[in-house]
Design a protein with these regions (language model features):
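Short amphipathic alpha-helical interaction segments
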Residues: 356-370
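Short beta-strand motif preference
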Residues: 39-41, 155, 384
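Short, amphipathic alpha-helical interaction segments positioned at domain boundaries
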Residues: 389-422
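A short, conserved structural fragment
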Residues: 370-380
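C-terminal scaffold of the Radical SAM
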Residues: 36, 58-82, 93-356, 414-415, ...
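Basic, amphipathic "hinge/linker" alpha-helix immediately C-terminal to the N-terminal HTH DNA-binding motif
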Residues: 382-389
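Flexible, acidic/Gly-rich N-terminal and inter-domain linker regions that tether
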Residues: 1-37, 47, 85, 90-91, ...
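Local cysteine-cluster metal-coordination motifs and their immediate loop/turn environment
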Residues: 41-57
Length: 422
């Protein structure tokens, strides 16, 4: 962990203490939180393992996948029955469901059962989103997913360029094939994920990918910089920060000129189109291996071991492996960190969540950020500037490599560690 990250944490949290995660495993969860609650479901199986991908995954094996699906439904039943935020006999209203992976469509045939299990305890108000590998964008798969209730898909294109896709060890998707499948099996909202800051990639390369995505079925694109995690097998070097900023500014300028609306740090949408986000939920329950649960005062992560996950659920025990109990200041910072992804922090929303004014909690920090040109204060909200978006990205990169990289690296090696300090 860099001195810069440690200094920033100490200044912002007002404490020299590291973040302490323990093996606390509650048998009851309390989802009583201000505002909407979201749900996340993780499906870890892939046809092949991409070297650059940091997420919890393993090769698809039918028998293991079936056992996992049963355990996933079992965890949903356990949490639903033990959730103190749900009135017995009634369904708890939630905003939306997001299904990530892995390649969740490998279990498309079980997705309806998973959604019905969730539906016994939770009433989904704003639809179901699901990640798709380009090879799974087929009419018959889309039909299964629609039948299960999926209303949004995010397609992991990364790049349509054969040269750039080969750097990631993947074949380049055919945009015409994607468009034909989406036309035959339409989904209300389609997002496509793209990567920038790859070796030899120009701004024009990224713009061409964005244009192909928008011309072949996407309502929305997410354009992420490549991040080199220490525990992956990727040999692709990360770009310098200056190069990332040049590309990010050029992407934002192009989208502004062509009328695409920037609705988060990395995402751009057609005007008036449906939005797709997997990141901007203040509180959510996570199901499946490696899934995170974020509540009013706690952060929990499930084991990264598929076998360990299945065994824990079969024993009737919660599969969480580490829990962080937030201080009030830490929880405020975590809230602001994720709200900043959406480019706007609402003063009313902060007050509703914490019962205190944003300026009262972070007056000096907000003043400094405005003076430095990172934020502008609008009626009722603070908005990130283009400069602020870049420096947020830079801070997020340090956070990712200093905290997430270390945590995920440990959890890939140990199914149920006793403690983690970061």
């Amino acid at each position: 962990m860099s001195w810069w990250t440690t200094a920033a944490r100490t200044w912002l949290t007002g404490s020299l203490s590291p973040f302490l995660f323990t093996d606390e495993n509650e048998e009851c969860l309390d989802s009583r939180v201000p505002g909407a609650l979201g749900l996340y479901v993780h499906v870890p199986f892939c046809r092949r393992i991409c070297d650059f991908c940091p997420y919890c995954k393993e090769l698809y094996r039918p028998q293991a996948a079936e056992a996992y699906a049963e355990a996933l439904i079992g965890e949903i039943e356990m949490v639903g029955q033990r959730d103190a935020g749900r009135v017995p006999g009634q369904r708890r209203a939630v905003s939306s469901v997001y299904v990530g992976g892995g390649s969740p469509a490998l279990q498309a045939g079980r997705m309806g059962e998973v959604m019905r299990a969730l539906g016994r305890f939770y009433e989904v108000r704003d639809g179901v989103g699901l990640e798709l590998h380009p090879s799974d964008v087929r009419p018959e798969v889309l039909a299964q997913l629609r039948e299960a209730g999926v209303t949004r898909v995010s397609i992991g294109v990364q790049s349509f360029s054969p040269r750039l896709a080969s750097l990631l060890g993947r074949p380049a998707p055919d945009p015409r094939r994607l468009e034909a499948a989406l036309r035959e099996g339409p989904v209300p909202t389609v997002s496509m994920d793209l990567i920038f800051a790859l070796p030899g990639q120009s701004v024009q390369d990224v713009i061409e990918d964005m244009e192909l995505a928008m011309a072949h079925g996407a309502h929305h694109v997410a354009v992420y910089p490549f991040i080199d995690f220490s525990f992956t097998a990727s040999r692709v070097p990360a770009a310098q920060h200056r190069r990332k900023r040049e590309m990010m500014d050029a992407i934002a300028a192009y989208c502004a000129r062509h009328g695409y609306e920037r609705d988060s740090i990395w995402t751009f949408a057609r005007p008036g189109g449906h939005r797709y986000s997997s990141m901007t939920r203040d509180c959510y329950l996570g199901f499946g291996c490696s899934a995170v649960t974020l509540l009013r005062d706690s952060f929990k992560v499930n084991t990264f071991s598929v076998q360990g996950y299945v065994e824990r659920v079969r024993e009737g025990r919660m599969p969480s492996c580490l829990t962080l109990r937030f201080s009030r200041r830490q929880r405020m910072l975590y809230y602001l960190f994720w709200r900043a992804y959406g480019m706007v922090v609402s003063e009313a929303d902060f007050r509703d969540f914490f019962g205190v004014e944003l300026a009262e909690a972070f007056g000096p920090e907000l003043w400094a950020a405005c003076r430095l040109g990172l934020l502008v204060h609008e009626p009722g909200a603070y908005r990130l500037t283009r400069r602020g978006a870049f420096y947020f990205h830079r801070f997020e990169s340090y956070y990712t490599l200093s905290y997430i990289d270390k945590m995920w690296g440990v959890l890939r090696r140990e199914a149920f560690p006793q403690e983690l300090r970061i």
